[in-house]
Design a protein with these regions (language model features):
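Aromatic- and acidic-residue-enriched segments that line the glycan-binding/catalytic groove
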Residues: 39-40, 74-88, 143-157
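A contiguous, low-structure linker/loop signature
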Residues: 67-107, 123, 130
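A structural signal for well-ordered alpha-helical segments within the folded catalytic domains
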Residues: 44, 48, 115-118
Length: 250
């Protein structure tokens, strides 16, 4: 295992070989023979599963938690927990009203599952360090988080209701930045903004709505001295240039 090699590669440095990061989410539960619904709500199980995944796959880095519903749940979205998958978001409070109109504020360390995640990080970080494995913190990106808050309406709102879309995505960006700060405090070596649904929009739309609302999070990672990354899913070739301009290390 080679934590520094992964950090170097993420920062654009040449390495002797490609580092290896298995994105083990609910697979961590499988490795320790637990149901995913229990796993994602128990600090001891999370720590055990993350350590097991790092050891089993000889990982150079491993996510502390691969669950993009954490921030949404922490501000009031209701989740559906599953035995064999990550939780899904069931309710979307901003379907018809902006976060300001609803009086939604910033989550704290005691909101939602954040206490569980902080506890799991404290338990597993020393084990990962001993294995020379980087701990990755994954913060839900602005557009994906906005889709949790407002539902699929957000994808038409970026064209037809721009003022509404800006209000929701700006709020999501602030939540993302606070999430990043939490992961930095936990000691994550690499912190990524994970915005999978951003691949569904045009580069021009990304620049208008996503780019400005990632900057606080990216700056928070860099201010901490941590390594930053931006994750996208699907066919993201059209977005490569604009994602790079957001300013992550990798």
């Amino acid at each position: 295992m080679a934590k520094q090699m992964l950090i170097d590669a993420t920062r654009g440095k040449r390495t002797d070989k490609a580092p290896w990061v298995p994105y083990a989410g609910c697979n961590g539960a499988y490795l320790i023979k637990e149901k995913a619904d229990r796993y994602f709500q128990d600090a001891d199980l999370l720590a055990k599963g993350v350590a097991a995944a790092a050891k089993t796959y000889h990982a150079d880095g491993i996510p502390l938690l691969f669950d993009l519903s954490v921030e949404a749940e922490a501000v009031g979205c209701k989740l559906e927990y599953w035995e064999d998958n990550v939780p899904s978001v069931r309710t979307h409070p901003c379907e018809t009203e902006t976060p300001e109109e609803l009086g939604l504020g910033m989550f704290t360390k005691s909101s939602g599952r954040w206490p569980i995640i902080f506890e799991a990080a404290a338990k597993v970080k020393p084990q990962l360090d001993e294995m020379d494995c980087a701990m990755l913190g994954l913060a839900t990106g602005p557009l994906t988080l906005a889709s949790h808050l407002a539902g699929v309406r957000i994808f038409t709102a970026v064209k037809k209701k721009k003022e509404f879309a800006h209000a929701v995505i700006e709020y999501a960006g602030r939540l993302c930045a606070e999430s990043v700060r939490f992961y930095a405090e936990m000691g994550c070596d690499i912190i990524a903004i994970v915005d999978p649904v951003a691949s569904q929009i045009r580069p021009e739309t990304f620049q208008e709505f996503v780019t400005p609302n990632c900057l606080e999070a990216v700056n928070a990672i860099h201010d901490d001295g941590s390594t930053s990354s931006f994750f996208n899913c699907g066919d993201c070739t059209k977005l490569i240039d604009v994602v790079c301009r957001v300013g992550p290390h990798g």
